Swiss-Prot record:
This is UPF0502 protein YceH. Belongs to the UPF0502 family. It comes from the Bacteria. Pfam families: DUF480. Gene3D superfamilies: Winged helix-like DNA-binding domain superfamily/Winged helix DNA-binding domain (1.10.10.10). It comes from Salmonella newport (strain SL254). The lineage of its organism: Bacteria, Pseudomonadati, Pseudomonadota, Gammaproteobacteria, Enterobacterales.
Length: 215
């Protein structure tokens, strides 16, 4: 495994992967766009409050490591960023649409159950059933160039095991257990969060459209 991202780098890459699929008309993203995406209060765990300077430092580091590239074509007054983390022309990591959706959701929200992942990743890929989610996770866990995810030990009193990505190195399961949010209705919460995320995306699109009309 050659990926050793910090938590903030994982957030930046996760945001770019997400916006590439969910709001392609706004992609690539400017620094301000990345800041807004990183600090979203929906579909993010933990919620962050990064400054523009902090995000710029992460972007510069990721460009140097060839995980991102800058885009500044004709008529672009602002430098924008696009991901080269996966499925890029010269990159080694190739993922299916289902794999991208799960990896992105894990980068943005940490350890989750297959049920939570199916609900939360639905804006990026519509999984036909739980079997597809689980088989995709198993592929990511058993790839020869990986593994990219790991199945965690099932916690006492929980019906499902959670999965975590390995792009930030090995997983400290004890730390994850102590920081895991308690929820008696995880599936309902996931659906509410998915709806909140859709509303946030629509608001972002509307703001972008209004800003464009005002130019």
């Amino acid at each position: 495994m050659k990926y050793e991202l910090t938590a903030t780098e994982a957030r930046v890459i996760g945001c770019l992967l997400e916006k590439q699929v969910t709001t392609p008309e706004q992609y690539p993203l400017s620094v301000n766009g990345v800041v807004t995406a990183c600090n979203q209060k929906t579909n993010r765990e933990p919620v962050m409050n990064l400054t523009e300077q902090e995000v710029q430092e992460q972007l510069d580091n990721l460009v140097k490591r060839h995980f991102l590239r800058t885009v500044s074509g004709f008529g672009n007054r602002v430098t924008k960023y696009e991901q080269r983390f996966c499925n890029s022309e010269f990159g080694d990591l190739k993922l299916s649409a289902a794999e991208v959706a799960l990896v992105t959701t894990l980068l943005l929200r940490g350890a989750q159950t297959p049920g939570e992942l199916r609900s939360r990743a639905s804006r990026m890929h519509e999984f036909s059933d739980m079997t597809e989610v689980e088989s995709t996770l198993e592929r990511l866990a058993s790839r020869e160039d990986g593994p990219y995810v790991v199945r965690l030990a099932r916690e006492p009193g929980k019906r499902e095991s959670r999965y975590m990505h390995l792009f930030c190195g090995d997983v400290d399961e004890l730390s994850l257990q102590t920081s895991a949010p308690e929820s008696a209705s995880g599936d309902l919460q996931s659906r509410v969060e998915a709806l909140e995320s859709e509303v946030a995306e629509l608001k972002q699109r509307l703001d972008s459209l209004l800003a464009h009309l005002g130019e």
